[in-house]
Amino acid sequence: MGLSPFNLLFAELEVGKHLYWQIGNIRIHGQVFMTSWILIGALLTLVVVGTKKMERDPKGVQNLLEFLWDYIRDLARTQIGEKVYRDWMPFIGTLFLFIFVSNWGGALIPWRFIKLPSGELGAPTADINTTVALALLVSLSYFYAGLSNKGLRYFEYYVHPTPIMLPFKIVEDFTKPLSLSFRLFGNILADELVVAVLVFLVPLVLPVPVMFLGLFTSAIQALIFATLAAYYIGEAVEEHH
Amino acid sequence: MDSITTAASVVAAGLAVGLGAIGPGIGQGSAAQGAVEGIARQPEAEGKIRGTLLLSFAFMESLTIYGLVVALVLLFANPFAG
């Protein structure tokens, strides 16, 4: 870390401070793992409870899950297309739900009451490592989708309208994960920072509307990440004529 | 790091995001205008318009995000820190 202006100005913000766990030669950010596991556990519990006793007339949790299923299916079907969307729906749905629950969990659960030796608990998606991992997963899966559906004809996509597009399409393969990961990371970190700065300046009332705005944008970011992942996969499996 | 490099990095980081936000801001404005006009003319197409609008917003936003990447590199991983 070269310089950290936030730490100088606001001692509480703690950008770039982490709870390090040493595993072999790797130092990992422990607080991200803790929050991710808690949130994954909550999500799994919800899904298991909701699908335990399924009824013809959905009620309560089952109703919510069926609504989510419909929502994700529509998202995947419009972006990927009728033919292969079924294969990719679980992936898109997992991405959407994990990011959504991470963003909202980071904002809604009062993590501040749990004290850590260093760093603080928060949204797992406010850490660049989480979002880069998710974005690289998306990259791998659209390559896999293209290659498994069209074989080597997938590379026609690179020269599709004209071969002049070739360098741009190759650069795009690198900028796709870059922009996916930084979009999510930047938005979530910015939300947390804005709320933290406002709480620091005016601890009453004023931060509340900003918190609601943060909830709105983080829901939109989860939707955008899932939509773009589906769009990239759809682009890779699309047939050119 | 000497103080002139620090000052230049901080100013450059501010400019990278600030200038990078102008173009996409204008673009998103005109895209939103088009979407609102489309919904006003054809309210039943709202769902489809919203999906396309969000997707195109995301592509425009990525331009600002490249500015953000540059700013974060300057602030937290400065190659000239020495």
Swiss-Prot record, chain B:
InterPro entries the UniProt entry points to: ATP_synth_csu_bac/chlpt (IPR005953), ATP_synth_F0_csu (IPR000454), ATP_synth_F0_csu_DDCD_BS (IPR020537), ATP_synth_F0_csu_sf (IPR038662), ATPase_proteolipid_c-like_dom (IPR002379), F/V-ATP_Csub_sf (IPR035921)
Pfam families the record matches: ATP-synt_C
Record bears the keyword Thylakoid: yes
Membrane topology summary: Multi-pass membrane protein
Localization per record: Cellular thylakoid membrane
Site keyed Reversibly protonated during proton transport: positions: 61
Transmembrane segments: 7-27, 57-77
Record carries keyword Endoplasmic reticulum: no
CDD domains, sorted: ATP-synt_Fo_c_ATPH
Gene Ontology molecular function terms on file: lipid binding; proton-transporting ATP synthase activity, rotational mechanism
Keywords, sorted A to Z: ATP synthesis, CF(0), Hydrogen ion transport, Ion transport, Lipid-binding, Membrane, Thylakoid, Transmembrane, Transmembrane helix, Transport
Record's GO cellular component terms: plasma membrane-derived thylakoid membrane; proton-transporting ATP synthase complex; proton-transporting two-sector ATPase complex, proton-transporting domain
Recorded family membership: Belongs to the ATPase C chain family.
Quaternary context: F-type ATPases have 2 components, F(1) - the catalytic core - and F(0) - the membrane proton channel. F(1) has five subunits: alpha(3), beta(3), gamma(1), delta(1), epsilon(1). F(0) has four main subunits: a(1), b(1), b'(1) and c(10-14). The alpha and beta chains form an alternating ring which encloses part of the gamma chain. F(1) is attached to F(0) by a central stalk formed by the gamma and epsilon chains, while a peripheral stalk is formed by the delta, b and b' chains.
Role: F(1)F(0) ATP synthase produces ATP from ADP in the presence of a proton or sodium gradient. F-type ATPases consist of two structural domains, F(1) containing the extramembraneous catalytic core and F(0) containing the membrane proton channel, linked together by a central stalk and a peripheral stalk. During catalysis, ATP synthesis in the catalytic domain of F(1) is coupled via a rotary mechanism of the central stalk subunits to proton translocation.
Protein name: ATP synthase subunit c
Species, as recorded: Prochlorococcus marinus (strain MIT 9211)
